[in-house]
Amino acid sequence: MDKSGSPNASRTSRRRRPRRGSRSASGADAGLRALTQQMLKLNKTLAIGRPTLNHPTFVGSESCKPGYTFTSITLKPPEIEKGSYFGRRLSLPDSVTDYDKKLVSRIQIRINPLPKFDSTVWVTVRKVPSSSDLSVAAISAMFGDGNSPVLVYQYAASGVQANNKLLYDLSEMRADIGDMRKYAVLVYSKDDNLEKDEIVLHVDVEHQRIPISRMLPT
């Protein structure tokens, strides 16, 4: 009796027939693992830029000090002629300055060049007398006295220079949030005119944590 026509034989034949365009399970698994690794890497990269109470990129990939957080403000220098200067006092939001006795540990400046940036700038942060009008002469003198660190930021073909952060440590000075109005960010355009849309300065002020309101605004 010919058993080739039996149902079992027919099912076996169908199971063994290769499907067109199919991939092996091991190949599909390897592709899925590679894609998963890429997604995890991308998510980790994106997470770096998300602000949190302990921002991972606050100071050279360090976290804020225990019990501290930070407030960021953004400065966009106007057009600065070659060899000239710009100064702007720090102005924190009212929601932060209401707690003016909270201590400030560090100030960090991060430079974000925009696509047309092709210049060299010097950037610093200084405690400035309230009587100072931040004139060109006054700012020039502060750059030259050596009393604060200066970040020299130059054009990089890649668009972002690796060294784009300046850290100013205030922990020994016992400075507080109320003192921040006495500090200013200063910029010197060394080699060329700096257009108003060439760089953005992100100023991070690390300070003791402040209470968070849990009431909705009226």
Curated annotation (Swiss-Prot):
Principal location: virion
UniProt keywords (A-Z) are: Acetylation, Capsid protein, Ribonucleoprotein, RNA-binding, T=3 icosahedral capsid protein, Viral nucleoprotein, Virion
Identify residues that carry N-acetylmethionine: M1
Q: Where is this region: Disordered?
A: 1-30
Fetch the Gene3D superfamilies from UniProt: Cucumovirus coat protein, subunit A (2.60.120.530)
Q: Please give the InterPro entries that the UniProt record associates with this protein.
A: Cucumovirus_coat, Cucumovirus_coat_Asu_sf
> Which compartments does it reside in?
Virion
Basic residues: compositionally biased ranges: 12-22
Write out the GO MF terms: RNA binding; structural molecule activity
Q: Which family does it belong to?
A: Belongs to the cucumovirus capsid protein family.
Q: What does this protein do?
A: Capsid protein. Probably binds RNA and plays a role in packaging.
This protein's name: Capsid protein
At the highest ranks, the source species' classification is: Viruses, Riboviria, Orthornavirae, Kitrinoviricota, Alsuviricetes
